């Protein structure tokens, strides 16, 4: 079946099922192209909760579909590739986090949304890469436990005077971006601005003109008068950056910035998922309710 035929059948089935297709910013180009909404993990989950659709086809990785299930329990959440996981989310387990909490009694746990539902359920509050600084500053305590991303935690710590207990997790894709690669590109393209994600390591962030979330990157590149940007995050972001800014040039900071899990989902997978209405991701209520409380506490913090 040709791609155009697959896309047509996907759209037909979405209509028949009262479905909506959500795609993360790191998905393959052709998946982002047919999505009803593209965005970051939390933004998509909020859209899932707001939509009138009864079926959510979530093109992303497992923890994202879980978040959609947490915020939209009355909807059917499909994850076309159940094997699309997140190594960073898997780096922290419930027993390990409970042990860390026991070593630091009374210290609140701030959990990055790139985490499993089970971890969110034993956390005090969640954060995104965009609002992490604001979330941490909102807490009255002088100490926090930050999981699972050490790089995001270190980035946030620069803007607060709190004591951090980091989990030693990281994103393997962002970790592959090394300072040498950035320095070479900055020398080759001296007029280019380098922007990177806070999941990058601190040595890379130190070279950046701007550090921000994926949503922040779209805004920054659209508003900034510069014509050339070096991009320090997963390659999938280039699709929308180029589409929204056809007169600007975007250079991926390293060919290693490709997440294999984000690239698993194909158009064929989406079609098969809609045909069979599987695989369904459903978070059990005993996990969903406390996990939703951690997300709700974050969502209650006023946005800028």
Curated annotation (Swiss-Prot):
Cofactor: [4Fe-4S] cluster
Species whose genome carries this gene: Geotalea uraniireducens (strain Rf4) (Geobacter uraniireducens)
Name of the gene: nadA
Places the protein is found: Cytoplasm
InterPro entries: NadA, NadA_sf, Quinolinate_synth_type2
Family: Belongs to the quinolinate synthase family. Type 2 subfamily.
Pathway: Cofactor biosynthesis; NAD(+) biosynthesis; quinolinate from iminoaspartate: step 1/1
Gene Ontology CC: one annotated term: cytosol
Official protein name in the record: Quinolinate synthase
Organism ancestry: Bacteria, Pseudomonadati, Thermodesulfobacteriota, Desulfuromonadia, Geobacterales
Coiled coil, from the record: none
Catalysed conversion reaction: iminosuccinate + dihydroxyacetone phosphate = quinolinate + phosphate + 2 H2O + H(+)
């Amino acid at each position: 079946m040709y791609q155009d035929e697959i896309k047509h059948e996907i759209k037909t089935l979405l209509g028949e099922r009262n479905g909506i297709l959500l795609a993360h910013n790191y998905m393959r180009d052709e998946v982002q192209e047919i999505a009803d909404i593209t965005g970051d993990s939390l933004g998509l989950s909020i859209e899932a909760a707001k939509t009138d659709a009864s079926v959510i086809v979530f093109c992303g990785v497992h923890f994202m579909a879980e978040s959609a299930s947490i915020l939209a329990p009355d909807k059917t959440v499909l994850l076309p590739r159940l094997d699309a996981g997140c190594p960073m989310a898997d780096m922290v387990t419930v027993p390990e986090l409970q042990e860390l909490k026991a070593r630091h009694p009374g210290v609140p746990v701030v959990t990055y949304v790139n985490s499993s539902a089970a971890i969110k359920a034993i956390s005090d509050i969640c954060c995104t890469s965009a609002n992490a600084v604001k979330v941490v500053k909102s807490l009255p305590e002088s100490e926090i436990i930050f999981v699972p991303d050490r790089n995001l935690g270190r980035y946030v710590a620069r803007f607060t005077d709190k004591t951090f207990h980091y989990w030693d997790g990281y994103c393997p894709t962002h970790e592959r971006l090394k300072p040498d690669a950035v320095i070479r590109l900055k020398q080759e393209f001296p007029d280019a601005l380098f922007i990177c994600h806070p999941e990058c390591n601190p040595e890379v962030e130190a070279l950046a003109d701007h550090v921000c979330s994926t949503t922040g990157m779209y805004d920054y590149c659209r508003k900034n008068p510069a014509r050339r940007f070096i991009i320090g995050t997963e390659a999938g972001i280039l699709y929308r950056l180029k589409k929204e800014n056809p007169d600007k040039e975007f250079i991926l900071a390293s060919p290693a910035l490709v997440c294999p899990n984000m690239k698993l989902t194909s158009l064929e997978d989406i079609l098969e998922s809609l045909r069979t209405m599987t695989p369904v991701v459903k978070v059990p209520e005993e996990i969903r309710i406390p996990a939703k409380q951690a997300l709700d506490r974050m969502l209650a913090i006023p946005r800028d």
